[in-house]
Amino acid sequence: MFLRQEDFATVVRSTPLVSLDFIVENSRGEFLLGKRTNRPAQGYWFVPGGRVQKDETLEAAFERLTMAELGLRLPITAGQFYGVWQHFYDDNFSGTDFTTHYVVLGFRFRVAEEELLLPDEQHDDYRWLTPDALLASNDVHANSRAYFLAEKRAGVPGL
């Protein structure tokens, strides 16, 4: 369910949002990042993902979001659960008058690059970066870099 902008602003102002983030790896061990065109995190490189909608199962959200973000509909079983994360932003989708808080479920999976049809609605460019390269870049948002920090990986299988 998509809300009118005024209703969505009330939700964002009042409650955390639930989202899925995708830690997408190619065959060379590089990870997909898109340069965001919208708030929050506008102008930063960020892993793909998106919000879970009201009354939407996680399975349905995973399929909808992989299609919307990658052009490839994948079942939730394609991803390895990568933990629960918290993202806090000083701005929101419409400006800076209130903050945004996400509770994020991370999923990691590998894809064949040639199967992806990357959209341009929320990102104006895409890159594949190694963990070392993305950790070294201040253009990669701290919330995306956190998925690759050694101290964060300790309890998360896979990386």
Swiss-Prot record:
Substrate binds at F2, L3, F8, R36. Residues 13-153 form the Nudix hydrolase domain. It holds the Pfam family NUDIX. The keyword Lipoprotein does not apply. It comes from the Bacteria. Keywords: Hydrolase, Magnesium, Metal-binding. Its cofactor is Mg(2+). A motif (Nudix box) lies at residues 50-71. Mg(2+) binds at G49, E69, Q122. Its EC number is 3.6.1.-. It is an enzyme of class 3 (hydrolase). One of its GO terms (molecular function) is magnesium ion binding. It catalyses: GDP-alpha-D-mannose + H2O = D-mannose + GDP + H(+). Binds 1 Mg(2+) ion per subunit. Hydrolyzes GDP-mannose. Homodimer. Belongs to the Nudix hydrolase family. This is GDP-mannose mannosyl hydrolase. It comes from Escherichia coli O157:H7.
